[in-house]
């Protein structure tokens, strides 16, 4: 009889400790989240290029002969898989 009582007490102690561990593991629901302050970033204005700089860049990107490159064909041969 004493063994049965000891087992019941041990089981009750184990269940209560498991319940206590589960209760402390969950976050408190009543706590309010901390307010975050939002920092705004001010971007510097970009200076526009002068007309001379634009002309130099345009000269740099022109093709020498004025010919366009031949268009590449993108058709691929596709084989149908065997059924």
Curated annotation (Swiss-Prot):
Main location: periplasm
InterPro entries per record: Acid_shock
Pfam families: Asr
Signal peptide from the UniProt entry: 1-21
Biased amino acid composition, Basic residues: 57-70
PTM comment text: Proteolytic processing gives rise to the active protein.
Single GO cellular component term: periplasmic space
Record keywords, A-Z: Periplasm, Signal
Subcellular location as annotated: Periplasm
Family listed: Belongs to the Asr family.
Described purpose of this protein according to its UniProt entry: Required for growth and/or survival at acidic conditions.
Protein name: Acid shock protein
Organism of provenance: Salmonella heidelberg (strain SL476)
């Amino acid at each position: 009889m004493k063994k049965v009582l000891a087992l019941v007490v041990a089981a009750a102690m184990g269940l209560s400790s498991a319940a206590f561990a589960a209760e402390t593991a969950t976050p408190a629901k009543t706590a309010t989240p901390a307010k975050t302050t939002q920092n705004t970033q001010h971007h510097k204005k970009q200076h526009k290029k002068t007309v001379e700089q634009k002309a130099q860049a345009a000269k740099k990107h022109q093709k020498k002969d004025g010919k366009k490159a031949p268009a590449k064909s993108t058709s691929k041969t596709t084989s149908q898989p065997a059924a």
